[in-house]
């Protein structure tokens, strides 16, 4: 750790610094997390006014009590202030439902409103975006990423085709607080206009050149004043205001690698500006090469190897908490590096790398690799690079100087639109065989959709240059997967327009039922048969037709892409992700998907069947319990075993904030069914083990039920009879016969009255051929009945 980093951490967290020196955290709850030199998130100027949707808050000097916020959608410096940082409540240490943080410091030196931070090539600062949402066109201004060097943060972006490096800073010039923006142009620049501040009173028009430009004092409409100076400004540069009250600097021609520095203070003392201007603007290139280590202390934990009976054991990969940095470990996504280590992100913005994933788990070593990300809940490793999906962007993390920490946080793609709504999480991250990236994005709560990406699956090209909506109509899709054949699966959980949790097989352009998040035109039908046509994601369409978006009396779509399996609340109240079994070392499940319940902390096997062009599925529990809400899964290429990760939040049964687990196949007999079929005469179950014929062919060993759900804008649905529509309850069906195949693995249950239903259940109590008890339940969905079945395979 360099002296500057150590000084920075001590100034930021006096209490934590003592604990860091001691190497322990005996009073972890008494100190705030060590958050690093920057923090990403939506940042509010007040409760009703956003400073930046994709905000980057950078801590500067002044003993860690000076800050700036950038809007990375528009490359605008949104605010600069001193004093307190942001009002987080408990959101740095817990998962709660508050609005985004607001600027806590009261001394805001200057700020600007939502809009472009640089003028376009015609010199205009007029915002071209719809509803001031999303990034500017890439040929206007585009964020490339940021470099971390000790306590400095250097932003990299383009204005038009001009690359720009920017270093924010703060100087205490003999008691005068001065903020600084150092801008460097690696390829030179010509005729660029940069926004400084908004809300200027009166007109400003003056030359602004040389190594001691200004200082010039301007007044804000709210009574504040701001003094601006600069150095390194080329001849012909101007400080001007616009009729809209924006203060800008028009930069004349700059040579390759020229740097300029813009200075800002709430005090008009020219002496402070003169003192700062004596120093030449920094060459920022050395700060892009990596600096000192920020997080020198690794955390060592001891895992717990499962010792339960059965074919699958749960091993616990003990999380790095407590840790010297007092950061929580609500795990959000993970993947494996080529050498077998795992990279895992946390909801509060960290990425850890863990080694020691061997048979015994006796020494797990955790290294804090990155921090400051915007609620990352997905992570994917591609060709050794770590990609992290946050609410603002997919970030590619680069360790420039190979010291074990990320130095360059590259913006791989930030085309997604962000709003302040807490419920629009970005969830999971996967790639297909062509290298395209996929992630899911939640719909808002309340479900008044206000952006084109809420409630969708988004697809990003392998080079990160283009993003598109792959599918829509999602509510809270906490996890998905892309299978070996590029099959896309995604879960969703009960709520408005979601009668129950479910598993979707997703085709391009699919609409999966969450009506306010359709993101396209639909035909909606009222109960009286009246139809209207329009896009329910459009606020104007909703307003014109008085659509609330979550009322049970609202019109429903005439059709939507139904799930391959509904999942009842008692099995899963909040779905996690899915993962395909790709390993030969994990028993009889290779090629099948697995389904995680975040809410119940459980794991299920998925058995799909195809009837004509219709795919439907059934689920069976593994009977394993996890201490956290499992929602991400990957198979390790090193040991062939399943790894799961998850966290504790609302609506789940977790006992630990974060958990990382290995589900290990022991080689013992698996007594679960691994295949199902439904036909006109009944249900066929194929087990992984031989069954005892006597118990298998006893009809009293089974109980079969059917039920439906009601699709509407209401929150969830009761369970309704299929036979008597409108009546709450299940239909109990008679098992007329049970026949076992010659290999003693496949059962045919001849069921009287089996028909198409949202949900069926088969409970069974059997004995395996080796005498083991085989007792569980299968639930599934029947969209279409296949032909008559037999007990033969």
Label the predicted regions.
Residues 277, 283, 667-673, 692, ...:
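Acidic, Ser/Thr/Gly/Pro-rich low-complexity segments and short DxT(G/T)-type signature motifs
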Residues 155-159, 181-185, 192-198, 245, ...:
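Short, hydrophobic/aromatic-enriched beta-strand segments in well-ordered soluble domains
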Residues 276-670, 693:
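Beta-propeller domains with acidic blade repeats across secreted/periplasmic ectodomains
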Residues 690-736, 762-768, 776-780:
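Short, surface-exposed alpha-helix to beta-strand junction/turn motifs within ectodomains of secreted
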Residues 219-295:
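Extended acidic/polar, glycine-enriched regions
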Residues 179-181, 681-685, 747:
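Structural beta-strand segments of beta-rich domains
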Residues 27-56, 267-315, 786-793:
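N-terminal pre-domain segments of enzymes
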Residues 27-180, 191-217:
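Beta-strand-rich N-terminal accessory domains
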């Amino acid at each position: 750790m360099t002296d500057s980093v150590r000084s920075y951490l001590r100034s930021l967290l006096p209490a934590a610094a003592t604990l860091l020196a001691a190497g322990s955290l005996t009073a972890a709850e008494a100190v705030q997390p060590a958050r690093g030199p920057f923090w990403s998130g939506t940042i509010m100027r007040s409760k009703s006014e956003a400073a930046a949707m994709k905000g980057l808050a950078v801590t500067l000097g002044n003993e860690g009590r000076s800050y700036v916020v950038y809007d990375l959608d528009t490359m605008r410096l949104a605010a600069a202030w001193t004093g307190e940082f942001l009002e987080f409540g408990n959101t740095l240490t817990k998962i709660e439902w508050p609005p985004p943080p607001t600027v806590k410091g009261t001394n805001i030196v200057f700020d600007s409103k939502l809009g472009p931070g640089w003028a376009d090539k015609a010199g205009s600062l007029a915002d071209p975006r719809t509803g001031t949402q999303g990034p500017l066109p890439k040929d206007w201004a585009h964020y490339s990423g940021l470099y971390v060097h000790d306590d400095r943060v250097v932003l990299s972006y383009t204005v038009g085709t001009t690359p720009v490096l920017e270093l924010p800073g703060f100087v205490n010039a003999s008691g005068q607080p001065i903020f600084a923006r150092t801008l460097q142009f690696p390829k030179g620049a010509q005729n660029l206009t940069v926004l400084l501040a908004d809300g200027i009173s009166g007109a400003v028009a003056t030359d602004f050149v040389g190594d001691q430009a200004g200082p010039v004092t301007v007044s804000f409409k709210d009574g504040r004043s701001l003094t601006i100076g600069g150095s390194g400004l080329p001849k012909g540069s101007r400080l001007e205001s616009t009729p809209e009250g924006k203060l800008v600097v028009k930069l004349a021609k700059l040579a390759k690698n020229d740097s300029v520095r813009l200075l800002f203070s709430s005090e008009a003392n020219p002496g402070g500006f003169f003192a700062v201007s004596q120093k030449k603007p920094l060459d920022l290139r050395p700060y892009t090469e990596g600096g000192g280590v920020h997080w020198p202390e690794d955390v060592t934990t001891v895992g717990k190897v499962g010792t339960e009976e059965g074919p699958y054991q749960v091993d616990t990969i003990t999380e790095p908490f407590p840790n010297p940095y007092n950061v929580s470990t609500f795990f959000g996504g993970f993947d494996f590096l080529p050498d077998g280590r795992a990279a895992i992100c946390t909801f509060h913005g960290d990425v850890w790398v863990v080694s020691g994933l061997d048979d015994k788990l006796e020494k797990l070593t955790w290294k804090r690799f990155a921090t400051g990300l915007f609620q990352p809940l997905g992570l994917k490793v591609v060709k050794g690079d770590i990609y992290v999906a946050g609410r603002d962007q997919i970030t590619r993390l680069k360790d420039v100087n190979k010291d074990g920490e990320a130095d360059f946080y590259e913006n791989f793609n930030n085309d997604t639109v962000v709003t302040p709504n807490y419920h629009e999480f970005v969830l999971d991250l996967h790639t297909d065989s062509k290298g395209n990236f996929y992630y899911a994005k939640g719909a808002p709560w309340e479900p008044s959709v206000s952006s084109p990406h809420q409630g969708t699956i988004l697809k990003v090209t392998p080079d990160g240059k283009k993003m598109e909506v792959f599918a829509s109509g999602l509510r809270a899709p906490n996890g998905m997967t892309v299978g070996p054949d590029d099959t896309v699966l995604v879960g969703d959980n009960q709520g408005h327009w979601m009668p129950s949790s479910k598993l979707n097989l997703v085709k391009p352009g699919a609409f999966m039922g969450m009506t306010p998040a359709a993101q396209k035109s639909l035909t909606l039908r009222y109960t009286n048969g009246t139809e209207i046509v329009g896009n329910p994601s459009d606020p104007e369409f909703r307003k014109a037709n008085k659509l609330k978006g979550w009322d049970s009396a609202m019109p429903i779509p005439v059709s939507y892409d139904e799930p391959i399996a509904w999942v009842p609340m008692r099995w899963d109240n909040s779905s996690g992700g899915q993962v395909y079994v790709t390993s030969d070392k994990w028993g009889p499940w290779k090629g099948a998907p697995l389904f995680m319940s975040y809410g119940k902390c459980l794991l299920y096997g998925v058995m799909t069947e195809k009837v004509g062009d219709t795919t439907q599925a059934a689920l069976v529990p593994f009977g394993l319990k996890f201490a956290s809400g499992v929602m991400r899964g990957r198979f390790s290429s090193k040991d062939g075993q399943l790894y799961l990760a998850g966290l504790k939040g609302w609506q789940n049964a977790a006992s630990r904030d974060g958990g990382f687990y290995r589900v290990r196949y022991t080689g013992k007999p698996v007594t679960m069914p691994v295949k199902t079929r439904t036909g006109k005469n009944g249900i066929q179950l194929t087990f992984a083990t031989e069954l005892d014929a006597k118990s298998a062919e006893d009809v009293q060993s089974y109980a079969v039920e059917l039920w439906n759900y009601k699709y509407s804008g209401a929150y969830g649905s009761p369970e309704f009879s299929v036979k008597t529509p409108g009546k709450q309850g299940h239909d109990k069906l008679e098992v007329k016969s049970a026949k076992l195949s010659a290999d003693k693995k496949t059962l045919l249950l001849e069921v009287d009255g089996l028909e198409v239903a949202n949900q069926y259940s088969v409970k069974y109590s059997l004995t395996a051929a080796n005498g083991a008890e085989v007792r569980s339940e299968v639930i599934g969905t029947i969209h279409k009945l296949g032909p008559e079945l037999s007990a033969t395979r």
